């Protein structure tokens, strides 16, 4: 019985102390706030916001390094005003020789018409024997005797050339004029770079000759050709005075 009373007393004491502890924890006044804690870890990035308005242009930066590649050519502009006339340039180089006149069909047609007109307008001279027509050629003289260069200039001035026979018939026509004036005449032939080789004035090689036996023998010193009253040829220097006979 004593043991029972002691047990009850202990139980009551335990029960009483427990009630007191509970009251101190649950029913006491708030304590002093604690110190702030340290910052936590950064949170995740938020979503992109709405695009803002463009800002004002910034100042021009310094020049870059190497220049860029050239751009494409622009469109052609309007023509400018004509410039002043420049000074006359130096003469150009001599061009290559042209084709001989006898190979130009159009030129031959023109010459044929000229010959026809000459024959019609020079009828009086033809009666005097100063104009002779042979085939497609017309030979004429004014009766004057001058040197080779003067004859060449005279014939060119009237639209012709120094008479140059290319057949026996043409040679005989020239002889008839030479006999009429009882003198010699220069022919339209000149010696080339090689002694003894003669050419027409247009540069074509001679295709008909009637040299006096042993001629030519000037050995490059006699560059021109004269025709005798018998129709034979002789090489001669170009400074002698001979009858001027032109061909058209």
Curated annotation (Swiss-Prot):
Is this entry keyworded S-adenosyl-L-methionine? no
Q: Which residues cross the membrane?
A: none
Please give the residue positions where the record annotates the modification 4-hydroxyproline. 30, 33, 36, 42, 54, 57, 63, 67, 70
Q: Which regions are flagged for Pro residues bias?
A: 54-65
Q: Entry's Gene3D superfamilies?
A: Mannose-Binding Protein A, subunit A
The UniProt record lists the keyword Transport: no
- Which intervals hold domain C-type lectin? 132-248
PROSITE patterns with a match to the protein in the record: C_TYPE_LECTIN_1 (PS00615), C_TYPE_LECTIN_2 (PS50041)
Q: Name one GO molecular function term.
A: carbohydrate binding
Q: Which residues are glycosylated?
A: 207
List the disulfide bonds in this chain: 155-246, 224-238
Q: What are the protein's UniProt keywords? A: Calcium, Collagen, Disulfide bond, Extracellular matrix, Gaseous exchange, Glycoprotein, Hydroxylation, Lectin, Metal-binding, Repeat, Secreted, Signal, Surface film
UniProt-annotated stretches for the region Disordered: 29-102
Q: What name has this protein been given in UniProt?
A: Pulmonary surfactant-associated protein A
This chain's source organism reads Bos taurus
């Amino acid at each position: 019985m004593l043991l029972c009373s002691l047990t009850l007393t202990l139980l009551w004491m335990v029960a009483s102390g427990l009630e007191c502890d509970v009251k101190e924890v649950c029913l006491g006044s708030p304590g002093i706030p604690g110190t702030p804690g340290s910052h936590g870890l950064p949170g995740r990035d938020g979503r992109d916001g709405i695009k803002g308005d463009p800002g004002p242009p910034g100042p021009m930066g310094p020049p870059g390094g190497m220049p860029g590649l050239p751009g494409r050519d622009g469109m052609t502009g309007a023509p400018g005003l004509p410039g002043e006339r420049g000074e006359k340039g130096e003469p150009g180089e001599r061009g290559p020789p042209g084709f001989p006149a006898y190979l130009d069909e159009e030129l031959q047609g023109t010459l044929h018409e000229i010959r026809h007109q000459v024959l019609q307008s020079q009828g009086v001279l033809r009666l005097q024997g100063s104009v002779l027509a042979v085939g497609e050629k017309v030979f004429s003289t004014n009766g004057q005797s001058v040197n080779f260069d003067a004859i060449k200039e005279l014939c060119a001035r009237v639209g012709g050339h120094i008479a140059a026979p290319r057949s026996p018939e043409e040679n005989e026509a020239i002889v008839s004029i030479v006999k009429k004036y009882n003198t010699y005449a220069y022919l339209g032939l000149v010696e080339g770079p090689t002694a003894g080789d003669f050419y027409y004035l247009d540069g074509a090689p001679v295709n008909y000759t009637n040299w006096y036996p042993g001629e030519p023998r000037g050995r490059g010193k006699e560059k021109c050709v004269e025709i005798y009253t018998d129709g034979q040829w002789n090489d001669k220097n170009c400074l002698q005075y001979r009858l001027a006979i032109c061909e058209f």
